[in-house]
Amino acid sequence: MIRGIIEASRRRGFAPAASWPGEERRDLISSAHAIKSRGQIPIIAEIKPKALGRPLTEEEVFAYARAYADSNACAISVLTEPSNFLGSLENAAIARKAGLPVLRKDFIFDLRQLSEVQADLVLLIAALGVDLDRFIEAARERGMEPLLEVHTEEEMDAALKTDAEIIGINNRNLNTLEVDLNTFERLAPLAKQAGVFLVAESGVHSREDALRMMRAGADAMLVGSELMGRPEKLRDLNRI
């Protein structure tokens, strides 16, 4: 799957570098701590058109972003990959109007992609085999904090050798698409020892799943499919 997405992206080409206003970056870690201090689970709520099987209109994107903000999400994740996930760069810009930190979620393999749209955070996937240090530095130069995603022990080891402050453990195997919450539970202790901010990704469908990830050491979790079509469910998921 990954190879096909990258090849499609190469054929599509890259968007021109965006002109970014001089806005301060919205900080995920501070936002998550604020949510937790209110007795709630910090959730990065995702706008994932593929879960509905169709692209979203601009009005729908903003409605989701506003609903997530009203339900106390700590941030909004936006899929920007168009071919497989039906996302767009415009969706990230629209979601940012809701006032929360926005994570651009895509398959970033070329430095030029980091200039395509303004976001507060950007997903960097260790499995893509890019120069992590170089991409982390480039993301920060563009005003974005990287969320470095791993799925295996080897990827975690590589991530911990960088100065990434936020590491996401994806419970989904990107090759098989199988999901196993044990992945987070197995890898989390390695990251917690290093003192990084830890995000659990994929597989959270219930409040019980969310609490399980928190007990395993998650500082926040990313939830996508479960909220599409029913963003109000966030109020149930984030209750401690």
Feature annotation, model-predicted:
Residues 181-191, 214, 227-240:
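C-terminal helical cap(s) of enzyme catalytic domains, especially alpha/beta-barrels
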Residues 166-209:
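Catalytic-face loop-and-helix region of soluble metabolic enzyme cores
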Residues 48-52, 81, 107, 127, ...:
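Active-site beta-loop-alpha junctions enriched in small/polar residues
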Residues 1-56:
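An N-cap/entry alpha-helix motif that binds or orients negatively charged groups
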Residues 102, 109-120, 151-163, 194-223, ...:
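Catalytic cores of alpha/beta
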Residues 5, 45, 68, 76, ...:
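Conserved, mostly hydrophobic/aromatic
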Residues 42, 53-140, 147, 155, ...:
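N-terminal active-site wall of soluble small-molecule enzyme domains
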Residues 74, 78-80, 120-133, 169-176, ...:
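Glycine-rich phosphate-binding active-site loops on the catalytic face of alpha/beta enzymes
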